[in-house]
């Protein structure tokens, strides 16, 4: 049995507080619910091989409900696990296996395509998880720590400018910017020269901190158009922790494929709203960066998903030297197939880390 890295600590009854009968019935209810998505009745448990009458099973299920581990939705006679119950099941009962060899080969083959950019590889990893695990695949890009080697503004026409930043580690980042009226080739060159003289060798974090006090000087040294380009360029590259990072989400349509999800459009709509809160979701995945393995959040364990009642299973991806780069995971309904999704997330994160290592 695998002990998992939990989400935030939530007070739930411990296994020691349940006798053998209660533990067995609780496990069977949760396993049946995760498989079918339907509330589980006492007769279902009785037919599953429990040597107790339906009445005795109902009494035990009632006791589990009073402990906050089971709940009865609407007027249904059946029971389903609460988020607290799912947390106890994941931490105390869940047995996690390994990823099938065929799936391992598929993950490795899709991530090993040559000529793919850094962000394309991350997007592919997110799509892989979405397809294999169901739910939406999510990945947050690393904090850029390499020093800046070169900066350039390239006119594209049609009112757009391409801001190009080349890093000392060979990575290139491009940002499309609106071209203000009156921008001339000389203003673009002037802005490029100004930034190259001051950013070369600095990380984006250092640049964001140190350049703040230099913008006033930039306005005095440059013409107004070039100064605005410098300011807009810095904002495009490093305008704060949320804006400096990319969040990639794939497979949101999977969240509508579940039969129960179709019955609860409000919950799905709330989940889509949650996914649109980019900065908060990046913050959640940044917490995963500090974890030593897979991290699981269930429902109200995060403020972000407290209303939609969704679950997040995520893991950090890192280099061979154990330098954490970012985090990748799956978001879906609370009844995700944890035994299947957890190893998929873990293996994809490890393959992605190896690929980023070159």
Swiss-Prot record:
- What does the UniProt record say this protein does? Negative regulator of class I heat shock genes (grpE-dnaK-dnaJ and groELS operons). Prevents heat-shock induction of these operons.
Biological classification of the source: Bacteria, Pseudomonadati, Pseudomonadota, Alphaproteobacteria, Caulobacterales
Q: What does the similarity note say? A: Belongs to the HrcA family.
- Report whether tRNA-binding shows up as a keyword of the record: no
Tell me which InterPro entries the record gives.
Answer: GAF-like_dom_sf, HrcA, HrcA_C, WH-like_DNA-bd_sf, WH_DNA-bd_sf, WHTH_transcript_rep_HrcA_IDD
User: What is the protein's species of origin?
Assistant: Caulobacter vibrioides (strain ATCC 19089 / CIP 103742 / CB 15) (Caulobacter crescentus)
Listed name of the protein: Heat-inducible transcription repressor HrcA
Q: Which GO terms fall under molecular function for this chain's record?
A: DNA binding
Q: Any S-S bridges, and between which cysteines?
A: none
Biological process according to GO? negative regulation of DNA-templated transcription
What keywords are assigned to this protein?
Repressor, Stress response, Transcription, Transcription regulation
Domain of life the protein comes from: Bacteria
